[in-house]
Structures are given as structure tokens and as C-alpha cells.
A protein has these predicted regions:
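Beta-strand elements of repeat-based all-beta scaffolds
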Residues: 1-16, 20-37, 41-58, 62-79, ...
């Protein structure tokens, strides 16, 4: 990177080998007046007599304006659409409020140490905070009053977190304050080990399964070794960009990277190549697939995509408002879809190419309160103070209600007929029981890695699951106790299923992990072929009949 300065020591030009550059001009006080990039896009800055920024004008002409008090604090910001956000402060400079468009006000309160002790949203709902002597948050109560508690060691490392249901997760650290353990409320522990410079070298899950990591001298990950010994390898260029990834079966994807660290080519293990081209600003201009399909992109001065076209002659154009919200999407085949927004940036209207509109309303906290379809039928939404949906009322007054525990897991759903479905969770927030509106139950058990080990259905029948070291289902035990055995390759593709009666089904894959052969228990074979992009091109059944597929 090269730099140029003027006589006053101001940076006036910077550039790199990738073609990126930036030019600057200044006023007599050393304030930046203009900033121009390699594409000639210029942002301009205007200041008052005190050197405070009054207006920022972006390359597309959109502006943001700023107002200040006598203490040089920003008291108002007006965006490119004229929407004004104002701020107030206490005597020591803590922000007391933020008001959007003179309507939606967020308020903040502080203790004597200038720490935030409460935040109140425009609906009047507040969250509160407590601290220890080192300014660490020890309690956080949300808008519903649900409290999460935190504890720390002498080095201010988080050592425990207790959720709203009273379940505690603990954390352990080494002498260098690196996390070496995490224990769940059910006493299931993940362990971590590091090298001398802080790279993670080993992780052990609650089942005792170990994953190892190896690095080069620059701390780039070079190998990841699974609990079953499967190795994934990574190679890098001198800038630290990944240039190849080799999976456990020895299949390699290769990458080419330009001077701006953009991937310009990806060569798959099957020889298929994807190429990518970029403009001077590093924006993707075009991409070409292995079969020659090309997609092109055009941008406006502030990096919004304004046009997409492809080699199939399909073109879509986009327009935006001054805040960069999409106003319209136009396709020659489909027509134009348009979008409108309120002064807070919420989508309030969406009109399809046939002129049919969906409209939306929001409360001052930005929560959607209603949605009306093109026929004017309205669905209404209500929320609890913490923002969880409590009721959805569809046209005709059909209301569905939701109940939650203190961790905001959904515990009940009451349908419009008044029937209630219930869900029970364990201390790790895993579903252990579901009861439908008719009172029928399904239950679940888990191992220490949170994998489902059994499902008991509504008839009381239980199916059991055992897993290998990669988390693949290895044995399925049905309700009668009969077992099916499953096997996998190094990439965890299912290769063989032996059912309880000894019947064997096998699966074969190519170097892209696409299924290419399926052999059923009667030794009948089905073959599959694919193109370089992974699209299925043919299926040949055991009788020799072939079905072919083409793509546009």
C-alpha cells in the first residue's frame, strides 16, 4: 500500500496493488472535504465553524445532516428522506433518550458510575441491569421481568450463567483466561485445549469424543481430524487465503484468489470450474458456472445491485429509495413488484406485477401488528413486553395463542377451537414431551451430545437410536427390539443399511458426494448421473430404463 501526504501532513492519496485507491481533499482546518474512490465516486463533507460535521453527501447525492448542542454532542440526525432522530443527555454526557420522528422514544437510566441500569422502549416496557464492582453485568431482567444471572472470576471471566428457569451453565478457564470447559445445566461438559499461541488444538464433547486441529506457522488451520480419524486438509497462499480444501476421501476443491482476496476461480474435485470477475471496487460483476451459465451484476454509486442479467437473456432491474430500501424489482417476464416503507424503514406495502397489494402495520417498537392481504383480510399480531408473539388472530377472528416458559420456549399453543397443545423441555431447553390437542403424547430422550436416543410415539411404541463418533445414526431399534445397522464412508455419506431381517441396501457416491448407485435388498441396482454443476441428469432403473433430465 502506498500513501501520499500534503504539506500539512494530511493523507491525500492511498492505493494498493489490487487497484484500490482513495483520494482526499481538506479545508484549512484539516477536515476532510471530499473522499473519492477508484471508481470516481465522491463523498463530500460540510462542517460548521467549530469543525463539527454538519452534512455528509454520498456519491448518489443522498445526504445525512447533524445537529449539536453547546457541549458538541449530537442532538439530531436527519437522514436522506428527511426523517429526524433526536437525542438528549444528562449533565455528564450519558444518552438519556433517542426519539425517532418525534414519536418513538427509547429512554435510558444510569447509576452513579454511569452504567446503564434500565432501558425503556417506546411502548413503555423496560429491561434492567445490575453490576458488580468491576462493572460486569450480574443480573439482567428483560421486559417481562425474567432474570438472567451472571458470575465472574477475579479476572472478569464469565464463570456461570443462570437462565430464567434457574438452570446454570458454568465455564472454566486456564491461567491465560482461555475457556477450557463449558458445563451445561445437566452437567454435560465440553472441553477445549490450546497451543502456546492460543490456537484451539483439541475439543472433547460430553461423550468423550475428541476433534483435533493443526495449524501452520501463521496459525492457519491446516488439518481437522474428526473423532473417527477422518482428516480434512486446508492449504493457503502467502496472504492467508484458502487455496485448496481436501476432504477425508481425498477429494480436493481448489481456489484462485486475486490481489484483493476475492475468489476468482473454484475448481471442484470433478473438474468443474466456477469463475468470478470483480470491478475495481471489489464488487462481483459476473460469475460463470462449469456449464457456461453466466450471471452479470451492475451497481449504483452506493453499491446497490441495480441490474442482474444472465446468459439466458433474463434481466431484472432494481430501484431504491434514498435510504437504500428496495423500491421496485422489474423482470421482463414477471413484471414489476414494488415496495413502500414507513418513516421507520418498515415495509408497509408490497404490490405484485398484477397490482395486488399486501399491507403491513407496526407498533412503535417496530413489531408487526397487522398484515392485510389483497382482499383486505387482516391477520393481527399481539406481543408480550419482551416481544414474543402471544396471539395471532386471522380473518374471521380465529385466534391462536402461545405460552412460554421463562426461557421463551413455546410451552403451549391454543388453537381457535380452544384446544391446547403442550411442550415440555429439559434444563438444556430440549423438547422432552409433546402433547397434542387431543392429549396424545410423544416423548424424547437424548444422549450427552443432545442427540435423540429414543422417541416414544403416541401409541406408546419406542424407537431407539445409537450413533457413531461423527453423530451418524448407527443402529435403529424398532418397537419390537429388532435392529437395523447403518454404515457410512469417510465423508459421512450413508453407504449400507442392514435391516433386522438381514436385508442389505447399499449406496455409492462420486467424488462430489452425489449418489450414483443404489442397490436394494434384492440386489437390484439403480444408477444416477450428474453434470458438472451437480444437477441430476439421468436415472437408470434396475430394468434398464433410463429417464433423463435437462435444465435451462
Amino acid at each position: 500500500i502506498t500513501y501520499q501526504y500534503d504539506g500539512a501532513g494530511n493523507l491525500i492519496h492511498s492505493s494498493d496493488n489490487g487497484g484500490n485507491s482513495m483520494d482526499y481533499t481538506y479545508d484549512g482546518a484539516g477536515n476532510v472535504l471530499t473522499q473519492t474512490d477508484e471508481l470516481g465516486r465522491t463523498a463530500t463533507y460540510k462542517y460548521d465553524q467549530y469543525g463539527r460535521l454538519l452534512k455528509l453527501t454520498e456519491a448518489d447525492g443522498s445526504t445525512t445532516s447533524y445537529e449539536y448542542d453547546v457541549m458538541d454532542r449530537i442532538i439530531a440526525v436527519t437522514d436522506a428522506e428527511g426523517h429526524r432522530t433526536s437525542f438528549t443527555y444528562d449533565k455528564v454526557g450519558n444518552q438519556l433518550s433517542m426519539t425517532e420522528e418525534d414519536e418513538a422514544t427509547y429512554q435510558y437510566a444510569y447509576d452513579k458510575k454511569d452504567r446503564v441500569i434500565s432501558q425503556t422502549n417506546p411502548l413503555g416496557a423496560s429491561s434492567t441491569f445490575k453490576y458488580d464492582g468491576n462493572d460486569n453485568v450480574t443480573e439482567a431482567a428483560d421486559e417481562n421481568g425474567t432474570v438472567t444471572k451472571y458470575a465472574y472470576d477475579k479476572n472478569n471471566n464469565l464463570v456461570s450463567q443462570t437462565d430464567g428457569n434457574g438452570n446454570t451453565t458454568t465455564y472454566q478457564y486456564d491461567e491465560l483466561d482461555r475457556k477450557i470447559g463449558e458445563t451445561s445445566p445437566l452437567k454435560e461438559t465440553n472441553e477445549y485445549r490450546y497451543d502456546a499461541i492460543g490456537n484451539l488444538t483439541k475439543s472433547k464433547d460430553p461423550m468423550g469424543l475428541i476433534t483435533e486441529y493443526k495449524y501452520d506457522s501463521l496459525s492457519n488451520l491446516t488439518e481437522q481430524i474428526s473423532p473417527k480419524g477422518a482428516v480434512t486438509k486446508y492449504d493457503y497462499d502467502k496472504h492467508g487465503n484458502v487455496i485448496s480444501v481436501t476432504d477425508p476421501k481425498g477429494n480436493t476443491n481448489q481456489y484462485s484468489v486475486d490481489l484483493n482476496d476475492n475468489v476468482t476461480k473454484m475448481t471442484q474435485a470433478n473438474g468443474g470450474e466456477y469463475t468470478y470477475n470483480y470491478d475495481k471496487a471489489g464488487r462481483l460483476e459476473s460469475m460463470t458456472s462449469p456449464l457456461g451459465y453466466t450471471k452479470n451484476f451492475s451497481y449504483d454509486k452506493v453499491d446497490n445491485v441495480v441490474k442482474e442479467s444472465d446468459s439466458l437473456k433474463s434481466t431484472t432491474t432494481y430501484t431504491y429509495d434514498k435510504l437504500h430500501n428496495m423500491k421496485s424489482s422489474t423482470n421482463a417476464l414477471d413484471g414489476t413488484t414494488s415496495f413502500s416503507y414507513d418513516k421507520y424503514g418498515n415495509l408497509v406495502k408490497e404490490t405484485d406485477p398484477l397490482g395486488r397489494s399486501n399491507t403491513y402495520s407496526y407498533d412503535l417498537a417496530g413489531q408487526m401488528t397487522s398484515a392485510a392481504d389483497p382482499l383486505g383480510k387482516i391477520t393481527a399480531y399481539t406481543y408480550d413486553p419482551a416481544g414474543n408473539i402471544t396471539d395471532i388472530t386471522k380473518p374471521g377472528g380465529r385466534k391462536t395463542s402461545y405460552g412460554y416458559d421463562k426461557n421463551y420456549n413455546v410451552t403451549s399453543v391454543t388453537d381457535p377451537m380452544g384446544y391446547v397443545a403442550k411442550t415440555v423441555y429439559d434444563k438444556d431447553n430440549r423438547v422432552t414431551e409433546e402433547t397434542d390437542a387431543l392429549g396424545q403424547k410423544e416423548s424424547y430422550t437424548y444422549d450427552k451430545d443432545s442427540r435423540v436416543t429414543s422417541i416414544t410415539d403416541k401409541r406408546g411404541f419406542t424407537t431407539g437410536f445409537d450413533y457413531d463418533a461423527h453423530g451418524n445414526i448407527q443402529v435403529v431399534t424398532d418397537k419390537t427390539g429388532l435392529k437395523s445397522h447403518l454404515e457410512y464412508d469417510k465423508n459421512d455419506n450413508l453407504t449400507k443399511v442392514t435391516d433386522a431381517l438381514g436385508g442389505v441396501t447399499t449406496y455409492g457416491y462420486d467424488n462430489m458426494d452425489n449418489l450414483v448407485t443404489f442397490t436394494n435388498a434384492a440386489n437390484k441396482i439403480t444408477n444416477y448421473t450428474y453434470d458438472l454443476e451437480g444437477n441430476l441428469t439421468s436415472i437408470k432403473d434396475p430394468a434398464g430404463r433410463t429417464e433423463k433430465f435437462d435444465y435451462d
